[in-house]
Amino acid sequence: MKEIYHDIFIGNEQDYYAIQQESNWAVLHCCKHPFHCQFVGYRGTLPSTHPNYALKRIQNEMALNLVDMDRFSENYLDFNRDMFDTAFSFLDEYRLQGYKILIHCNQGESRAPTIGLLYIARLGTFEYADFDTSVQKLKEVYPVYMPKRNIFLTVKSLWRDFVLNPVEEVNT
């Protein structure tokens, strides 16, 4: 587990189990198995029409239906934008109450650090730098970062939706 911003940590499944019983943590589970499946109560696949298809919150924990794959598709950008927006509102709620935040996935190498990167960049951690610069800065503090293609390109595609960059001109 590594602190990447004041009281915001990224890590793996074992890091979650280490803090699970502590009351001053809010947790974002960035993995379908086992957390989203357990929170919603299913095995295998869930119909996309299910009300908790994208995510489910139980008190100070939220589980995302997020799988790590190499295949990227722009077809899921709107789905992911909405999911990340809801997840970041959840994290903001607890961060502003003084909770420590753990953003984790199974191995702590791909999904959690990438979503953690987007979240802390949105807070201004890297002075609203562009995506590639922010990735390099994250790698300096979290060298085990090895994103898979899908989550990497998804967050890169959504970067401007979440990270304001007052230095960069936006041509519309």
Predicted segment positions?
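Cysteine-based protein phosphatase catalytic domain of the PTP/DSP
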Residues: 2-100, 121-155
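A phosphate-binding catalytic loop at a beta-strand-loop-alpha-helix junction
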Residues: 99-117
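Alpha-helix boundary/capping detector
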Residues: 113, 117-120, 160-165
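Charged phosphate-binding loop/patch that engages nucleotide di/tri-phosphates or the phosphate backbone
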Residues: 144-172
